[in-house]
Structures are given as C-alpha cells and as structure tokens.
C-alpha cells in the first residue's frame, strides 16, 4: 500500500510539474507576442515609470526547499564514503589546495564545480586506466547545495576528521591557524593535555565520603573526572548516520582520534574546519577544542581589525562570527556543546595563546 501511495504522490508531483511548465510556456509565448515597451520597462513590472536601476539576473528559486530553511545538514555518511574511496595523495593535495591555498582556489573557481585530478587516482575499466576525479562544488552565496555534495567547508571537515595523523605528518595547516599559533600550541600536546587533565576542576563538587583517602578525594576533583562525566552524556546522544560513518571509517585507513589525549587530536582542527568533524564529535572535549580555536580566531581578528573604526568592544561585536557559526554548525549535527569545557580551555591556555 505504501509503495502504491508513493507512486501516486510521485505521479501527482510530475503532473503538477508539467502543468507548471505548460503555464510557463503559455505565459512566455504571451510575453513574446507583446510589443516591447519604448520606455524600457519589463512588461510584468509593477512600476509606472522606469526605475533608476537596470534589470539584473533572474534568480530561479525552483530548486530551493522551503521546508528546510535553517541551514542544510549534510549527509555525512555519503560524503565520508565518497572521500574514503579515493587514494590518500589526491585527498591530501586537494586539502592543501582548499586550506593552505584555499583563498586563491576559491576565488579563481567561484560558482563552478571543480575536479581534482592526480596520477595516483584512477579506475580500471576493462583494463583501460581512466582518471578518477574528485569533485568539489564552489558555491556562491546564492547556490543551494545538495545534502551529499562536497563543498570546500564540508571537504575540510570530513578530511580533517578522517586523516588527522596524515595531516600532522605533512604539516598541512590553514593560514588562519598558523596566525593564531597553532603549531606552537600542538608542539607538546601530550604534556599539555596531561597537565590540564590533572588540574582541579572548578565545576565539580564531589561528595567525598568520610574516611576516603586524601589522594582519591583529590583525584575526584580533577578535570579528567569532569571529562569522564561529559563522555557519559555524549555516549547517550548518538545519531545513527554519524555512527554508521564512524564504523565505516574504522574498517579502513582513517585515523580519527578516540580520545582528546591522542597525539593527533588537535590536528583535527589544523585546516580550520567550520564545525567539529563528525568522526570525533562523540569524543569528550573535541568539539569544545574547536570552539576554543574559533574564539582565538575571533580575538585575533579583534586585535587586527585596524581597518574598522570604533572601540574594541564594537569591533568585537562585528567580529564574533567564527565562534557563532562554529557553534551553530556543530550543534546542527545533533550535540550540544558544553560551555564549561570551553571555559576550562580558555582559563588554562587562553592567556598563553594570546601572548604568544
């Protein structure tokens, strides 16, 4: 029955589409037969006299889905499977072109769908080698992206989440991360995060039973314990699609970190993805680490905003865009960020990073 209903609704949609096309064709014919207005006003314009502006492009909104206005969520599983199907060299070279040289690549190819080609990436069809292109769409502000379409932002997000170790080895980094001192920050990550985990956490008030050894009572106040609690919360909030992607990635080469203390953990953000990559969104503290980096980018923009006039506060208002959009995009993937962890990072490393 369901299948029949679907067929019927599909046919109804088709009929409606044909009716619309016929109406368009009829109205177009009418337009063609109308004599042109000597004043240069378009026949269906409601103004009596011509506007001082010339007529611009016709924006076609047929493709826009009004039911989903709040920013599109990507189909991460399909995107992940597509990217994992390529050889590592072409993925990393494309990442280099879209992060280190990103500005230039995007500027030169705006509004088109580009193909990356590399000799390592080919497919055999009946014994004939054919290049296997990696397609990336370079949208303008107006274009609507399909859920499984790769854009520079989505590409950086998925590749950073899948291959942080390879990015670390080759030291591929976004210019903006270089400016906020990322390489200095990750130089001794293992020691840095270990010290952080052993610090006392201001947000925990452990119920220490009388007679508990002092050492254990002290351990219960550490940041590590707060992160364990956060991990429990995250474990209950999984989205099926992202789980599927993580399982698929685990069966291949990818090296996504399973713990914030992994040596490659901060490298997930080396190419400044605009959200937390889906492969490590359920690792306690990872999404918040990305938010910490985006705050640093905003602070750097505030300090560097020499072109804008006004007080530092006004500049801050203008510039807090990275952090806001990072939060919005990451939370659209189905998790809430823990602001307290971001605060812990700021208290621990904020001053050091800004001074650096």
UniProtKB/Swiss-Prot annotation:
GO molecular function, one term: endonuclease activity
Top-level division of the source organism's lineage: Viruses
Composition bias type Basic and acidic residues, residue spans: 26-35
Site (Important for the endonuclease activity): 45, 60
Positions occupied by motif YxxL: 135-138
Annotated segments matching region Homomultimerization: 57-82
Coiled-coil residue windows: 1-28
Name assigned to this protein: Nucleoprotein
């Amino acid at each position: 029955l369901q299948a029949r209903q679907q067929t019927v609704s599909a046919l109804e949609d088709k009929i409606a589409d044909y009716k619309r096309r016929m109406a368009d064709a009829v109205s177009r014919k009418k337009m063609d037969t109308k004599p042109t207005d000597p004043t240069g006003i378009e026949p269906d314009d409601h103004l009596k006299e011509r506007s001082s502006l010339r007529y611009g492009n016709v924006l076609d909104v047929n493709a826009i889905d009004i039911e989903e206005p709040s920013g599109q969520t990507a189909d991460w599983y399909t995107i992940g499977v597509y990217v994992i199907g390529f050889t590592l060299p072409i993925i990393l070279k494309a990442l280099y072109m879209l992060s280190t040289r990103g500005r230039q690549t995007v500027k030169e190819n705006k509004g088109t769908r580009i193909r990356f080609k590399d000799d390592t990436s080919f497919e055999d069809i009946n014994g004939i080698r054919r290049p296997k292109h990696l397609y990336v769409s370079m949208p303008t502000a107006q274009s609507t992206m399909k859920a499984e379409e790769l854009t520079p932002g989505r590409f950086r997000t998925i590749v950073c989440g899948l291959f942080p170790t390879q990015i670390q080895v080759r030291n591929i980094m976004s210019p903006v991360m270089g400016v906020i001192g990322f390489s200095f920050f990750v130089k001794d990550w293992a020691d840095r995060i270990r010290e952080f985990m052993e610090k006392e956490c201001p947000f925990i008030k452990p119920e220490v039973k009388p007679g508990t050894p002092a050492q254990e009572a002290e351990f219960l106040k550490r940041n590590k314990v707060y992160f364990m609690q956060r991990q429990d919360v995250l474990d209950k909030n999984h989205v099926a699609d992202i789980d599927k992607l993580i399982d698929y990635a685990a069966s291949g080469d990818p090296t996504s970190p399973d713990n914030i203390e992994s040596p490659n953990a901060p490298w997930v953000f080396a190419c400044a993805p605009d959200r937390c990559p889906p492969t490590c969104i359920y690792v306690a503290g990872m999404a918040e680490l990305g938010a910490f980096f985006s705050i640093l980018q905003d602070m750097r923009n505030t300090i560097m905003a020499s072109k804008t006039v006004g007080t530092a506060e006004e500049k801050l208002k203008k510039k807090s865009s990275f952090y806001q959009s990072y939060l919005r995009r990451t939370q659209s993937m189905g998790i809430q960020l823990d602001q307290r962890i971001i605060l812990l990072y700021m208290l621990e490393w904020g001053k050091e990073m800004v001074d650096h």
